[in-house]
Amino acid sequence: MASQLTQRGALFLLFFLTPAVTPTWYAGSGYYPDESYNEVYAEEVPQAPALDYRVPRWCYTLNIQDGEATCYSPKGGNYHSSLGTRCELSCDRGFRLIGRRSVQCLPSRRWSGTAYCRQMRCHALPFITSGTYTCTNGVLLDSRCDYSCSSGYHLEGDRSRICMEDGRWSGGEPVCVDIDPPKIRCPHSREKMAEPEKLTARVYWDPPLVKDSADGTITRVTLRGPEPGSHFPEGEHVIRYTAYDRAYNRASCKFIVKVQVRRCPTLKPPQHGYLTCTSAGDNYGATCEYHCDGGYDRQGTPSRVCQSSRQWSGSPPICAPMKINVNVNSAAGLLDQFYEKQRLLIISAPDPSNRYYKMQISMLQQSTCGLDLRHVTIIELVGQPPQEVGRIREQQLSANIIEELRQFQRLTRSYFNMVLIDKQGIDRDRYMEPVTPEEIFTFIDDYLLSNQELTQRREQRDICE
């Protein structure tokens, strides 16, 4: 009978507890689903200790070696480690606190942090050259180290240093220096002529002789100035050497390098021309070439060279007015004489009484200076055959040349027309009625002048005013 009751009780208990272990899973519950098992294990929650502010030693008693813990408890002065007690930590002199300066007794019976006292030390002082030091207490706080130098050396700087609370040594590191500076002797001063067509000369010399009277050691030698073998410009140049020994003594010496440039007298440009020169234009080896303005031909040597005797070779040429040969076989032969020398303004009119022609010639005759300044030559083609006239200045052109010029430049006899040709023989502008000289000059200045002409125009801006 008792056995039957026991079996019934077990079945009842199993039936009653079955819903409590149903394998239901919730996110973050601490349970994990597993399709291959139906059993689960409930996570046991540890029991939190009962908090009691009356327990005198809720946390262990604080003891900090080489330091002190000053505690304040809510329960009074006799409670130094009860729940809620706060302790301020500090170290003895010569020690540094590592960790928390303030901790509190927590409900977990632990302090809120840890700390300890580390003995303060300074770094080991480095040895000094030609000297030594002795210390009273090694590298510990308040240790004093006194410096001394070897015989023949003098101490410069702090004679003693003390290890301070911040872990640093007081003062600065001294040095032992010898009394005598090194001996140095520079090479002799020298003079050299510049090379042909150059304004510089390459100069060499031997290094200075240096010796130290103390231990014979020279740490470095510095040069103030160009290195040996450098190119020196014209003039005097001071070269200075400075030698340093191991004790930082120094000695200096200097010498002078003088470079001379052989120069010729300054050349003057020819009248109605200009010069282009190499190098500086007046130094030994320089070449100056003579050029003539448009409308002028050079007569004489084209260039001169500055010689070692400081004199120019040859004699200066002159720029003579350009001679135009109108007795040529073709218009091409006529135009070749102006190539790269002159610009041409060719005027064509049906007869000398043409109103446009007379107006244009009148304006140009009043602007001959501006035309010459811009290297412009006027060619006139006026009238009808057989009375047609062609002229350049006072020279008459043949009928064949007149006809070829008209065909080359497409100039009609039927009405007034005019063409401007540049120094390369290219048609640059055409006019069907008179234009002022200022309009022609502006066009030439803006579009046709070479760099050399632009320079001359800036120099001669007011020459025609």
Swiss-Prot record:
Residues 69-119, 120-178, 262-321 form the Sushi domain. Contains chondroitin sulfate chains. It is found in: Secreted; Cytoplasm; Cell surface; Synapse. The keyword Repressor does not apply. InterPro entries: DUF4174, HYR_dom, SRPX-like, Sushi/SCR/CCP_sf, Sushi_SCR_CCP_dom. Disulfide bonds join 71-105, 91-117, 122-163, 149-176, 264-306, 292-319. Residues 177-261 form the HYR domain. Expressed in neurons of the rolandic area of the brain (at protein level). Highly expressed in the brain, placenta, lung, trachea, uterus, adrenal gland, heart, ovary and placenta. Weakly expressed in the peripheral blood, brain and bone marrow. Expressed in numerous cancer cell lines and in gastrointestinal cancer cells. Higher levels found in colorectal cancers than in normal colonic mucosa. Acts as a ligand for the urokinase plasminogen activator surface receptor. Plays a role in angiogenesis by inducing endothelial cell migration and the formation of vascular network (cords). Involved in cellular migration and adhesion. Increases the phosphorylation levels of FAK. Interacts with and increases the mitogenic activity of HGF. Promotes synapse formation. May have a role in the perisylvian region, critical for language and cognitive development. It is linked to Rolandic epilepsy, impaired intellectual development, and speech dyspraxia, X-linked: A condition characterized by the association of rolandic seizures with oral and speech dyspraxia, and intellectual disability. Rolandic seizures occur during a period of significant brain maturation. During this time, dysfunction of neural network activities such as focal discharges may be associated with specific developmental disabilities resulting in specific cognitive impairments of language, visuo-spatial abilities or attention. This is Sushi repeat-containing protein SRPX2. It comes from Homo sapiens.
